[in-house]
UniProtKB/Swiss-Prot annotation:
Pfam families assigned to the protein according to its UniProt record, in alphabetical order: AIRS, AIRS_C
Location relative to the cell: Cytoplasm
EC number(s) from the headed UniProt entry: 6.3.3.1
GO molecular function: ATP binding; phosphoribosylamine-glycine ligase activity; phosphoribosylformylglycinamidine cyclo-ligase activity
GO biological process, one term: adenine biosynthetic process
UniProt KW Phosphoprotein keyword: no
Pathway: Purine metabolism; IMP biosynthesis via de novo pathway; 5-amino-1-(5-phospho-D-ribosyl)imidazole from N(2)-formyl-N(1)-(5-phospho-D-ribosyl)glycinamide: step 2/2
Enzyme class name: ligase
Keyword Repeat part of the UniProt annotation: no
Domain of life: Bacteria
Organism: Pseudomonas syringae pv. syringae (strain B728a)
GO cellular component, one term: cytosol
Official protein name in the record: Phosphoribosylformylglycinamidine cyclo-ligase
C-alpha cells in the first residue's frame, strides 16, 4: 500500500463544488435574458437557437471581444458589478453597425482561483448587458486554472451572434460626398485605452479614489460601463431606412474606426468643436501631457458611435434617436478625399 497521500483535483487548486455553486447562482440571470428562439436552458453541451421568424434570407453575424486592461482597474478597485456590461457592449455594438440584431451571447471567464461571489457579480453584469441589448445569455465557460493566473485575478472574453436580412446589410458602400455624420455620446472611455489610462495614473501618482470631476468620483467616471446602442440604432434603421454606415468608436478612436466603414475616395470631416469633451478626458490629457492627435487615436473622447445618413434624412434621424432616449448631434460630413489625404480629417483640434 502506497504511503503517498491521495491527491484530489481540489489539492491541485480546482474546486469543482465552487464551479457548480456558481452555475446555480447564475441560472436565474440567464433565464431573465431568454429570447423565444432559444431552445433549452444552461447546462447542456451546446446551446440551441432558431433563426427568428420573418427573415427571408437571414445572414448570421458573429463577433468576439474582451474588455482590455479595464479589467486590471476593476480588479484593483474590487469593482466587478459592471465589467460584464462592458463585455457585452463591446461585442453587440460591433454587430449592430452592420444592421444586425444580436441573438445570443456566450462568455469565457478564466481565473487562478474561483471566487464565486466575484464571478457571480461579473455574470450578473453580463446578464444586465444582454437585457439592454435584447440578446440571450445561452452559455459560457468558467475555467479555474491554477498557475496560469495570479490568485483570484481573472480574464474575460465574450462571443455574440446576431442576424440581419441579406438585402439590409449596412456596409458603407452607399456612403457619398455630402452625407451627414451623426454622433452618439459615450459614457466615458468605455473599454479602450486603459493601458494608457493606467500609465497616466501611475506617472501622475494620482489617488483616483479621492479625486472628483464635475461632482463625481474619478473612479466612477473611469469605470462607467460601455454604453449599449443596440435598441436605439435598430429603431433608427427600422423607422427611417436611412442609415448608410455606422462606426463603433473603440480602440483607435475616431481616426481609426470611421475609415473601417468608408468606401474608397470618401473622407469624413469631423468637427471636434461640435461637442463638449467630458472632463475625464481633459483630466487624462493634462495629467499625461497627451498630444491632441494621440487622444483621438486612442480614446473615444466622448463619442461612442458615428452614423452616416444623407443630408435630407438628418432631422428625421435625430428625432428617432432622441425619441429613443439618445442625445445625438451632427459631428461632421462626408467629403471627396483628395489624392493621398487621410480618410478622417479632424477640424478645430485645440492646440496642445
Amino acid at each position: 500500500m502506497s504511503k503517498q497521500p491521495s491527491l484530489s483535483y481540489k489539492d491541485a487548486g480546482v474546486d469543482i463544488d465552487a464551479g457548480e455553486a456558481l452555475v446555480e447562482r447564475i441560472k436565474s440571470v440567464a433565464k431573465r435574458t431568454k429570447r423565444p428562439e432559444v431552445m433549452g436552458g444552461l447546462g447542456g453541451f451546446g446551446a440551441l437557437c432558431e433563426i427568428p421568424a420573418g427573415y427571408k434570407q437571414p445572414v448570421l453575424v458573429s463577433g468576439t471581444d474582451g474588455v482590455g486592461t479595464k479589467l486590471r482597474l476593476a480588479l484593483n478597485l474590487n469593482k466587478h458589478d459592471t465589467i460584464g456590461i462592458d463585455l457585452v457592449a463591446m461585442c453587440v455594438n460591433d454587430l449592430v453597425v452592420c444592421g444586425a440584431e444580436p441573438l445570443f451571447f456566450l462568455d469565457y471567464y478564466a481565473t487562478g482561483k474561483l471566487n464565486v461571489d466575484t464571478a457571480a457579480q461579473v455574470v450578473t453584469g453580463i446578464g444586465a448587458g444582454c437585457e439592454l441589448a435584447g440578446c440571450s445569455l445561452v452559455g459560457g465557460e468558467t475555467a479555474e486554472m491554477p498557475g496560469m493566473y495570479e490568485g483570484e485575478d481573472y480574464d474575460l472574453a465574450g462571443f455574440c451572434v446576431g442576424v440581419v436580412e441579406k438585402a439590409e446589410i449596412i456596409d458603407g458602400s452607399k456612403v457619398a460626398a455630402g452625407d451627414a455624420l451623426l454622433a452618439l455620446p459615450s459614457s466615458g472611455p468605455h473599454s479602450n485605452g486603459y493601458s494608457l489610462i493606467r500609465k497616466i495614473i501611475e506617472v501622475a501618482g494620482a489617488d483616483i479614489e479621492n479625486i472628483q470631476l464635475d461632482g463625481k468620483p474619478l473612479t466612477e467616471l473611469l469605470m462607467a460601463p460601455t454604453r449599449i446602442y443596440v435598441k436605439p440604432l435598430l429603431k433608427l434603421i427600422k423607422e427611417t431606412g436611412a442609415v448608410k454606415a455606422m462606426a463603433h468608436i473603440t480602440g483607435g478612436g475616431l481616426l481609426d474606426n470611421i475609415p473601417r466603414v468608408l468606401p474608397q475616395g470618401a473622407q469624413a470631416v469631423v468637427d471636434v468643436a461640435s461637442w463638449q469633451r467630458p472632463a475625464v478626458f481633459d483630466w487624462l490629457q493634462q495629467q499625461g501631457n497627451v498630444a491632441e492627435n494621440e487622444m483621438h487615436r486612442v480614446l473615444n473622447c466622448g463619442v461612442g458611435m458615428v452614423i452616416c445618413v444623407a443630408q435630407e434624412h438628418v432631422e428625421a434621424a435625430l428625432k428617432v434617436l432622441r425619441d429613443a432616449g439618445e442625445q445625438p448631434w451632427v459631428i461632421g460630413q462626408i467629403a471627396s478625399a483628395a489624392e493621398g489625404a487621410a480618410q478622417v480629417e479632424l477640424k478645430n483640434l485645440k492646440a496642445h
